[in-house]
């Protein structure tokens, strides 16, 4: 069986997990409420502030799904209790960002400003014009939003200009010599 799938998910105080028909799991916490439908190859059981996931049979797919379901459930529990954040840095002359409500205005060297509409459940802060902090309870959605923003102007390998994750390393190339 999957090593990750064997580990139980500890449920902190203030977080409740409801398992409905069809493996629809709803996690409620102080920050948000998340729900997801999981594969029917796994079974969820919640008792004494601990959730366990077991595969319905010993097929390779069911065992793999148990590990995946455990990791996703763990992220949901952490998201509704603590939340997640992702930081982006903008590098380049004249490149900047400004958060306005549920929109993010990006000036990235195009002839027009790029306006990115944030999905529900994700908030953005811009403590500096070249720094974006994205926060949310859903780790998957947060990563998707950060990836979409980065996609507008990926870091280029010669000068490093563009939007990058805070912990991202951009390998620099040497310019062509005559």
UniProtKB/Swiss-Prot annotation:
SUPFAM superfamilies attached to this UniProt entry: Ribosomal protein L6
Keywords: Ribonucleoprotein, Ribosomal protein, RNA-binding, rRNA-binding
GO terms of molecular function: rRNA binding; structural constituent of ribosome
Parts of the chain that traverse the membrane: none
GO cellular component terms attached to this protein's record: cytosolic large ribosomal subunit
Subunit-structure text: Part of the 50S ribosomal subunit.
NCBIfam families found in the cross-reference section: L6_bact
Recorded family membership: Belongs to the universal ribosomal protein uL6 family.
Role of this protein: This protein binds to the 23S rRNA, and is important in its secondary structure. It is located near the subunit interface in the base of the L7/L12 stalk, and near the tRNA binding site of the peptidyltransferase center.
Protein's name according to its UniProt entry: Large ribosomal subunit protein uL6
Species assigned in the record: Francisella tularensis subsp. tularensis (strain SCHU S4 / Schu 4)
Taxonomic lineage from the root: Bacteria, Pseudomonadati, Pseudomonadota, Gammaproteobacteria, Thiotrichales
């Amino acid at each position: 069986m999957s090593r990750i799938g064997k580990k139980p998910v500890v449920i902190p105080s203030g977080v409740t997990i409801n398992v409905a028909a069809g493996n629809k799991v709803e996690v409620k916490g102080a920050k948000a409420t998340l729900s997801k439908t999981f594969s029917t190859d796994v079974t969820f059981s919640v008792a004494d502030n601990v959730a366990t996931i077991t595969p319905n049979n010993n097929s390779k797919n069911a065992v793999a799904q148990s590990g995946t379901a455990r990791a996703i459930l763990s992220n949901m529990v952490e998201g509704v209790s603590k939340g997640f954040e992702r930081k982006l840095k903008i590098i380049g002359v004249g490149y900047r960002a400004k958060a306005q409500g549920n929109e993010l205005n990006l000036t990235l060297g195009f002839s027009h400003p790029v306006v990115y509409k944030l999905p529900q459940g994700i908030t953005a802060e811009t403590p500096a014009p070249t720094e974006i902090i994205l926060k949310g309870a859903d780790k998957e959605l947060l990563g998707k939003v950060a990836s979409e923003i980065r996609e507008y102007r990926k870091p280029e390998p010669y000068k490093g200009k563009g939007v990058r994750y805070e912990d991202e390393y951009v390998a620099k190339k040497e310019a062509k010599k005559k």
